[in-house]
Amino acid sequence: MRRRYALILGLLVLFCLAAFAVLFGEEVFQNYTAKTQRNIELKAHHEFIQSLRKNSSRLGAFSTDGCSGGLSRAWWTLSDRFPAFAKTHEKAPPWETCCLNHDRSYHSAGGATESHESFSLRLSADQALRTCILGTGRRRSADLSATFGLSEDQIRSAYEAIASAMFDAVRIGRLPCIGLPWRWGYGYPPCAVTIVPN
């Protein structure tokens, strides 16, 4: 019964947000959404920083899975099984160094000591990931264009889609204190927070 009410409430919220966007315009809606997301996320960053202070947490050894979500692992498997794939697309995702740099920032939470700083550093790390992937697309566009018979603009568009999807995935799924292994600040002991807007 609770699930049904939660579903109905969720649909009602989505309907209200859509109506808000139509009535007040896309820009106002995006600003409202960004502000709401920031407020929700800042609570998680506050809890994270408080947990670090309270527990005198020390940073653990760096570890990474490459590009998260199983992307690197799947890529490695494809490369091993299909040498032509590896020849064209490399043995690891061409943007894997972007993911490794991103993981380094996430591991240490960028060295943040305040919640607003933590929020800003996380956003900067996610934007740097997106920018790095786009740069990889620009560097590879001529070669891939010749290989696949597509225009360089089409190749860059594909990389824009990849960069946007990865940016959205890390923005949504890697908040601090959510218990996932590759969360913001994953080099520190886990903390927990109930993320509910005020």
What is each stretch, according to the model?
Residues 5-10, 18-198:
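Extended terminal accessory/targeting regions
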